[in-house]
Amino acid sequence: MDLPGPIHDILLVFLGSGLILGGLGVVLLTNPISSAFSLGLVLVCISLFYIPSNSYFVAAAQLLIYVGAINVLIVFAVMFMNGSEYYNDFHLWTIGDGFTSLVCTSILFSLITTIPDTSWYGIIWTTRSNQIIEQDLTSNVQQIGIHLSTDFYLPFELISIILLVALIGAIAMARQ
């Protein structure tokens, strides 16, 4: 996606702030359902980070797999939990929480001071040119799309129906 510089920066700041707010929601919200939906926001923001870098297939795969499947399973699992047994001995702040926050804060500040000083332009990511890699990725994505929509269409749809039936069966068994 060819965006002008300021719009690209604003988009990245918006996605980054959504990612940070969603991560804080996962950690700080006490209601498990709200925490699971915050995790969904985090996963959506992560998948949207791939769109400005022209990785549309990876963004769509992230949305389908993580948001569409994993997060839905987490929400179902949270809905079937008995919430009263988890809130009986709830302490607001423990020694382990303080130690963990100290370690995470020190790692955050070390990353904040290290990343701007690192010269990223001298790092050789690959030995091949970027054009060849982009052509390979484009052809691979096109090949995957062609095979999924022609050769493997019926098995792909059958597997999705089998997974849907298994999920509904698991929910029905958990209800009883």
Curated annotation (Swiss-Prot):
The UniProt entry lists the main location of this chain as: plastid
Topology relative to the membrane: Multi-pass membrane protein
| Gene Ontology molecular function | NADH dehydrogenase (ubiquinone) activity; quinone binding
Organism ancestry: Eukaryota, Viridiplantae, Streptophyta, Embryophyta, Tracheophyta
Its function, per the record, reads: NDH shuttles electrons from NAD(P)H:plastoquinone, via FMN and iron-sulfur (Fe-S) centers, to quinones in the photosynthetic chain and possibly in a chloroplast respiratory chain. The immediate electron acceptor for the enzyme in this species is believed to be plastoquinone. Couples the redox reaction to proton translocation, and thus conserves the redox energy in a proton gradient.
EC nos: 7.1.1.-
**Family the entry assigns:** Belongs to the complex I subunit 6 family.
Source species: Chloranthus spicatus (Chulantree)
Describe the subunit structure: NDH is composed of at least 16 different subunits, 5 of which are encoded in the nucleus.
Query: Which locations, inside or outside the cell, does it occupy?
Result: Plastid, Chloroplast thylakoid membrane
The protein, known as: NAD(P)H-quinone oxidoreductase subunit 6, chloroplastic
Q: Can the keyword Transmembrane helix be found in this entry's annotation?
A: yes
